[in-house]
Amino acid sequence: MRRRLSLTAALVLLLSLLCACAAQHAQEMDENGYELYFLSDPNSAGGGDAIRAQEKRLVLDGAMETEDCVRALLEALLAGPDEPSLSSPIPEGTALKSLKVSGRRAQIDLSAQYARLTGIDLSLADYCITLTLTQLPNVNAVSITA
């Protein structure tokens, strides 16, 4: 009985710490702050993570259509990172050809430069785009073609 009570108390403590951390992170980002995901420099101190977020303030009006919000985030992502320790997984010159939001899925068609990506490079680029776009409340899936 004591062990079960101790385990329950530890679990409650862990969950409250996680909730506090999430609330603090949400509070730190202002209402126009979004995270754009890029490749991190493998030689930078700390190492370990292949992808890291860069906070970007974008003016996305609450009345904007989801498609316009997706377009704004994609354009910021295609422009590349501001931080020198980050690099874009998306080939230079890649452009957005078309965009459609259907339900909660964003369907993105990128230019031919993106189609040259293969293997892990393609996976990382897809992952950065997906992580960036699924921050929007009306997007929970992303389809990418080139």
Q: Which role fits each region the language model picked out?
A:
Residues R3-A9, L15, C19-A146:
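Bimodal "functional hotspot" detector
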